[in-house]
From Swiss-Prot:
It is a peripheral membrane protein. Subunit of the V0 complex of vacuolar(H+)-ATPase (V-ATPase), a multisubunit enzyme composed of a peripheral complex (V1) that hydrolyzes ATP and a membrane integral complex (V0) that translocates protons. V-ATPase is responsible for acidifying and maintaining the pH of intracellular compartments. This subunit is a non-integral membrane component of the membrane pore domain and is required for proper assembly of the V0 sector. Might be involved in the regulated assembly of V1 subunits onto the membrane sector or alternatively may prevent the passage of protons through V0 pores. GO terms for molecular function: proton-transporting ATPase activity, rotational mechanism. Belongs to the V-ATPase V0D/AC39 subunit family. GO terms for cellular component: fungal-type vacuole membrane; Golgi membrane; proton-transporting V-type ATPase complex; vacuolar proton-transporting V-type ATPase complex; vacuolar proton-transporting V-type ATPase, V0 domain. This is V-type proton ATPase subunit d. InterPro entries: ATPase_csu/dsu_sf (IPR036079), ATPase_V0-cplx_csu/dsu (IPR002843), ATPase_V0-cplx_dsu (IPR016727), V-type_ATPase_csu/dsu (IPR035067), V-type_ATPase_csu/dsu_dom_3 (IPR044911). Present with 1630 molecules/cell in log phase SD medium. The gene is VMA6.
Length: 345
């Protein structure tokens, strides 16, 4: 019966998203891409997929890896915004929550660029389109966190996430900006998790709790590893940065905060089945991407669930990374590495 009510508000959206999912590149299509000799061949192969003639305005002479990435990403943003424009109520709020993470990245990027005297226009070009907000360009005038909040961020959706940041930064330097960014992400993920738990019905609720829990775990592991290089981050500060959700929470999260070396981090993960072998072999980011894609693929097995929006979005982002990787290998004639992409569909 919940399917009947779901379809009243969200049936069209889920249908569109599942159509997008069916347009994701298959293993056979990836194999065809890896056999291309030039970027022009790659463009031709992509034209027979859902990407169609998205590069038709780009001449062979000006075709580059960065242009392919830019145009593929632009297609993703257009499709996401189309879905968001069709949504309302809690589904619209859910779509908005997805964009908050990109907003946090944009804020950190703008502040970092400003303190290093980078060109404002250049920084704005690097900002993520889905994380754009009206006052973003004015971030470059802020000299400290308080003025940043009062003049720019107080009217944005990120404002509630700043309440635990003001005791962190006396001045805005690279270290403090990264600490602020991680605190914002922690508050954001926990808030998103609570929203999903309270507002989103099953089966989407369980799917999103799993996906957000994974996102929190990935951040926790990366923070634990990166903090090993800094003597300024003690266990108490580290605890303030690690999200209180996910498979790692609470026991492994506590041990990650206490870890002083690589062995300590590995020991903290040893009792968590999903991440047990992540630090043993291969590239850590590749392990994360692989697991994320498997979770997203599984999310599509559920019907009447807006969690498919998140699963499609993350799958599409991985697809853009894959295409960019293949294009870069072709451009640099690194044929032996061209198959190091991640595909689960």
């Amino acid at each position: 019966m919940e399917g009947v009510y779901f379809n009243i508000d969200n049936g069209f959206i889920e249908g569109v998203v599942r159509g997008y999912r069916n347009g994701l590149l298959s293993n056979n299509q990836y194999i065809n891409l890896t056999q291309c000799d030039t970027l022009e061949d790659l463009k031709l192969q992509l034209s027979s997929t859902d990407y169609g003639n998205f590069l038709s305005s780009v001449s062979s002479e000006s075709l580059t890896t960065s242009l392919i990435q830019e145009y593929a990403s632009s297609k993703l943003y257009h499709e996401f915004n189309y879905i968001r424009d069709q949504s309302s109520g809690s589904t619209r709020k859910f779509m908005d929550y997805i964009t908050y993470g990109y907003m946090i990245d944009n804020v950190a990027l703008m502040i970092t660029g400003t303190i290093h005297d980078r060109d404002k226009g250049e920084i704005l070009q690097r900002c993520h389109p889905l994380g754009w907000f009206d006052t973003l360009p004015t971030l470059s005038v802020a000299t400290d966190l308080e003025s940043l909040y009062e003049t720019v961020l107080v009217d944005t959706p990120l404002a509630p996430y700043f309440k635990n940041c003001f005791d962190t930064a006396e001045e805005l330097d690279d270290m403090n900006i990264e600490i602020i960014r991680n605190k914002l992400y922690k508050a954001y993920l926990e808030d998103f998790y609570n929203f999903v738990t309270e507002e989103i019905p099953e089966p989407a609720k369980e799917c999103m709790q799993t996906l957000l829990g994974f996102e929190a775990d990935r951040r926790s592991i990366n923070i634990a590893l990166n903090s090993l290089q800094s003597s300024d981050i003690d266990p108490d500060l580290k605890s303030d940065l690690l999200p209180n959700i996910g498979k790692l929470y609470p026991l492994a999260t506590f041990h990650l905060a206490q870890a002083q070396d690589f062995e300590g981090v590995r020991a903290a993960l040893a009792n968590v089945y999903e991440y047990r072998g992540f630090l043993e072999t291969g590239n850590l980011e590749d392990h994360f991407y692989q697991l994320e894609m498997e979770l997203c693929r599984d999310a599509f097995t559920q019907q009447f669930a807006i969690s498919t929006v998140w699963a499609w979005m993350k799958s599409k982002e991985q697809e853009v990374r894959n295409i960019t990787w293949i294009a870069e290998c072709i451009a640099q004639n690194q044929r032996e590495r061209i198959n190091n992409y991640i595909s689960v569909y």
